[in-house]
Amino acid sequence: QTIAIIGAKDVPGQDVDRVGRYLIEAGYRVLPVHPKRKQVWERQVYPSITMVDSCDIVVLFRAPQYCPGHAQEVLAMKNRPSCFWMQEGISSPEARTLLQDKGIAVVEDRCIMVEHRRLLQSAS
């Protein structure tokens, strides 16, 4: 599975860095997205989610006021993801409505790393 992370930064101690590294170590293909960075986690950075050819999940590490704009960008993708994931502390009714109306699953206010670990534990 391929996961694009909007707001990707490899700054030690930040949640986005911990989660990105965790997903890479878990075997996911992680695509960092950030308009001002060239490389994150030793990977090429996409300046916008619209530049990503395809991914299964978009994980958002941005403040809630930016969610609707990123939802619009996701809808402009040629190959849309099946899920738009807003990290813990982030929710946006407007983004949720935009995406769900187009058949994209939306997760709000949940950490993808915590949920992944929980699912692994319940499966074992």
How would you label these PLM feature ranges?
Residues 13-14, 20-41:
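NAD(P)-binding Rossmann-fold cofactor-contacting core
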Residues 39-72:
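Glycine-rich, highly charged phosphate/nucleotide-binding loops
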Residues 40-43, 94-97, 115-121:
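Short, charged, surface-exposed secondary-structure boundary motifs
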Residues 77-99:
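ADP-ribose/adenylate-binding Rossmann-like module
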Residues 81-85, 103-110:
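Short hydrophobic/aromatic-enriched beta-strand-loop microsegments
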Residues 105-124:
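Active-site capping/gating segments
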